[in-house]
Amino acid sequence: MQVKAEARYIRVSPQKARLVVDLIRGQQAGKALTTLRTTNKRIAPTVEKVLQSAIANATNRNENVDVDQLFVTEAYVNEGPRMKRVRPAPMGRAYRYQRRLAHIVIKVTEKEA
């Protein structure tokens, strides 16, 4: 049984979020939580919340699920919409820049013993 959790419109560059998500793909859920707690990146606590949500979704859907047998089968980051912003520049001009948003998706599956 595959269970999904996602966080949408997270204010982080998808490229930076992928660095953290790539660390936990394929890991056992408990080990992935430990990895995220020790990772020194700004997005790591957010990814940890998404993973905890996926684990909670699995236990809510099926009370017989063994949390120790849950594995991260899919974890990916998609690009969200971009917020366009303006920075004041010299001589009355303005420079445009974009703030990137990300959608984080984590799927966990119970591995058969």
Curated annotation (Swiss-Prot):
One of its GO terms (biological process) is translation. The keyword Aminoacyl-tRNA synthetase does not apply. Keywords: Ribonucleoprotein, Ribosomal protein, RNA-binding, rRNA-binding. GO terms for molecular function: rRNA binding; structural constituent of ribosome. InterPro entries: Ribosomal_uL22 (IPR001063), Ribosomal_uL22_bac/chlpt-type (IPR005727), Ribosomal_uL22_bac/org-type (IPR047867), Ribosomal_uL22_sf (IPR036394). Gene3D superfamilies: Ribosomal protein L22/L17 (3.90.470.10). It comes from the Bacteria. One of its GO terms (cellular component) is cytosolic large ribosomal subunit. Belongs to the universal ribosomal protein uL22 family. Part of the 50S ribosomal subunit. This protein binds specifically to 23S rRNA; its binding is stimulated by other ribosomal proteins, e.g. L4, L17, and L20. It is important during the early stages of 50S assembly. It makes multiple contacts with different domains of the 23S rRNA in the assembled 50S subunit and ribosome. The globular domain of the protein is located near the polypeptide exit tunnel on the outside of the subunit, while an extended beta-hairpin is found that lines the wall of the exit tunnel in the center of the 70S ribosome. This is Large ribosomal subunit protein uL22. The lineage of its organism: Bacteria, Pseudomonadati, Acidobacteriota, Terriglobia, Bryobacterales. The gene is rplV.
